[in-house]
Amino acid sequence: MLTEHETMDSLVGTRSVQHIMWRNDAVGPYLLPTMNKASGPNVPLGLHPSSTSSSLSKVFAVLSVLALCMWLLVGHRAADTRLALDTVPLQDVCPQEPAYNVTEALEGLKLQFPSVLHSAKLLSEAVQIDTTVGDNIPDTDDWAEYWDSIFSPFADWIQTSFPHMHDTASPVRRELVNKHGLLYTWPGSDPTLKPIVLMSHQDVVPVANETLDQWIHPPFSGHIDIENQTVWGRGSVDCKLWLVSTISAVETLVKSDFKPKRTIILSIGHDEESDGKHGAQHLSAELEKRFGRGGIGMIVDEGTPLLSSADPGSYGVPIAVPAVAERGAMNVKITITSRGGHSSMPPPHTSIGIMSLIIAKLEAHPFPDVLGDESSASIRQLQCVRDGPYMPYELRQALLKVEQAERALSDKGTTSCMHHMWPRMNRLHLKEARLDEARTQLMQALDYASRQLLKTTQAIDIVRGGIKVNALPESVFAYVNHRIAPYAKVSTVVQHYKGLLVPLAEQYRLALSMDDDVLVPPTNATTANVQIEKSGLLYDSHEPSPFEGSNADAWRLLSGVIRETWHTDEPRHELRSLDDDHVPKHNMGQYKDSVRVSPSIMFANTDTRWYHNLTSNIFRFGAMTLHPDLTGMSPYLHIHTVNEHASIDSIVKATQFYANMLVAANHEPIERV
């Protein structure tokens, strides 16, 4: 999009209009020639002072025609930009599916859900079993006793706590994959329907000993807090909330004598917090072996949650934001080796000093704040809450400009006059440039934390080196963690390193290698060796699952079930006492205000990274409460840190959601066309 003070010489390519500016004032768009200071204030640039008035008239006549054509090119709606920005209907940018009628799909069957107390106790008991897993743990065959001590008690608890699905007469079959991965299969009556998979994981992240005194309740107490309607402890959200609720949903359906047409699968890993290579990788391979590549209809795993009106990112609008993709991931290890010796005779830069230069270089050049076409789900999420009472005015206006640019780009009309007069003008290019500029302004309008969730990031997390204060460090290493935006790839990060560090290596006489690629070879003058290695699991972001068009059946079904399960006019489910054993009522149409739903991009990574061989219909959704947290502490801000907790309403609603999802998938198409 051409803006004020932007020249058109690159678009037109002729000197006579080289300094024409496009203006868009209240009276409408027009072209204005700028003045050449050397020629005087009243002479357009490109015309000699001796030009006749006739020449001037001809020039301005041409400019008038060009202005008319430009107005037709950009669109006559531009004159009403301010009005249009205020009147773009929200439903045009945030369409909503109707709530799915689960009651009708049940065909008279009554589901026997657990009581609120029983659901709370199940989550509490799960938290009390410590299933902590750290990084870089050896394989289950090498450390069999270690793995058994953690996960065998938990698997036994699951089997005891959900008796109906584990009964010998149950249609559900349980298998152990790679010893501790749990795979539950409930065969459907119609083998032509691809299975639906619900995922979760058993493991939790460690609790740092130095933080124990910061916990309101001990991290593995599973304390049921009646006052705040909360279950406290490590894993109460990530991921035992969803593990318990998915299993509870299947237990409910078995107990209620539900008969699935579509095969139902629970795939439960045991090292997601590490990288999933012992759990999810083996589970995925087993499912591909049984059902073939692309043999699964739909996967729902943990992921981005429901946001209450009080949660960050909602801007005051309750909304569900299931992720249709997740960012890629890459760890980089930087190792520097140099000559040691006594610190009384130091070189200009020690290995630690060189590492400091490299880190400073990286942090001085972060990845750009940009949005691409692959960011459409993230933009949709913002658009769906642009009427929120807490959204800043500048951000709302930036969103509206993106919407206008998207509309202009989707307008396929042409203007014949422009084709004749400006054959080199690329109308599509102008509209794409306008959209790029609008997206840039949108990123600039976001706060720093929000921008980090949408772009490729880097974080220097570990630096180690040196052994004694008077000894030159012979080696130092650092780890950098990257999360890769959907529009970028691992190769993008690799090129970023090469572009920054090759000149630095040449300047300071460093030998530089990246994996097996020698970027700057060593010489007799080399002062240190720098080795860069891609470390851990490398993971490119995948294309977002469709949320529009002919292949969006799975998304539409998921959205409809979410809107059936959560309503802003529904009160929270409460546990009045530890003797209160009431069963939550299933929604029978008494609640009308369904929650909004928007696709999003998962800012972190899940076990689904291993499941792309099975389906493109992968959704990452954190089924929780829609109500503000009574503790005053957002549960999303306490995952992986002190005071992790989940509301009692969350475990009740999550169980209802997964049961509703399985019932709906029994009746509706989710396969790709």
Identify the residue ranges that each predicted region occupies:
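Metal-dependent amide/peptide-bond hydrolase catalytic core
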Residues: 4, 22-24, 28-31, 36-61, ...
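Acidic/His- and Gly-rich active-site-bordering loop/insert found
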Residues: 48-50, 54, 58-60, 69-234, ...
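Sec-exported extracytoplasmic/periplasmic mature domains
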Residues: 124-132, 159, 163, 167, ...
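Structural recognition of the beta-strand scaffold that forms the well-ordered cores
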Residues: 127-128, 183, 197, 265-268, ...
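Solvent-exposed loop/turn segments at secondary-structure junctions
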Residues: 133-134, 191, 202-205, 271-275, ...
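Loop/turn elements at helix/coil->beta-strand transitions in domains of secreted/extracellular proteins
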Residues: 192-195, 260-264, 294-297, 593-594, ...
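Short pre-catalytic strand/loop immediately N-terminal to key active-site residues, enriched for Gly-Thr
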Residues: 227-238, 595, 642-643
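Acidic/histidine-rich catalytic neighborhood of metal-dependent amide-processing enzymes
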Residues: 230-321
